[in-house]
Amino acid sequence: MLYHYTDFAAFDGIIKCAELRLNNILNMNDASEMRLFMNGICKAVTDKLNQAGEIEKSRKTAAFFENEMEEEFHYSAYAACFSKYRDDAAQWERYGHLGQGVCIAFHEDLMQKMIGGAIALQEVYYQAVMSEHPLVDEFYTLIKVSKRFSEHLPEFQNLMNEAWVQSAAFKHPSFTSEREFRLVVSPFISNEFAIEPKYHVSPERIKKYYPLDLNRMCGKLNLHLSDLVGEIIIGPTSSQSIPILQDYLSDCGLNMLKDKISMSECPLRKPTS
């Protein structure tokens, strides 16, 4: 199972609208980690080129990575986050509205069958040193064997796109305990990406996001949304009653989920006012 901790407003969108919202990673705390990943790959590749005496190619590579970083919004990825941990205190506190929210469990095997193209289900990896990352050798080999290195090489740009995609699933090792997975959309890798973006307008700002149609994705496997959901856990500090939530699910046409509700057993304390 993959566990998605959220608040009840987002839960309503998932259940009633069958829509999973994927938000821009650059608007999340993870933006700095994407940059950390790209800078780490760049340093590992240029160090390796310098050691091989390819000083000019190393310089050009560093300059190209620098230019790419300035265009990071073009490479924006959009994600929804999950954890392998059920009823976890840290997840409730960080992502489940301080325990007042709700957790939806999704069947991982079914989600894997539903994705493809610009949509990927990625396990987050936590790595401090990039020198051992497979992309380093791929960049190094391509640049080393090219007689005249140019950032306009299609193979080089493809590798750069792959680096941006993988950066969306990178986090600092201090977050290893989260055991996170991400459902990631990378619109920049496909000209035929069929999902139209939407915008959430708040008093403070306008945010862009991509809505995944869960009914459509389930329909590809001849499944119903209720088949995708394994259980629903009410947060440890939530005042939500099970009978009201059962009525809500019935009114949404999801009677099959009524018996999959449970209360959290996590001993998280209610926030003090």
What positions do the PLM features span?
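Partner-binding and oligomerization surfaces adjacent to conserved cores of proteins
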Residues: 1-273
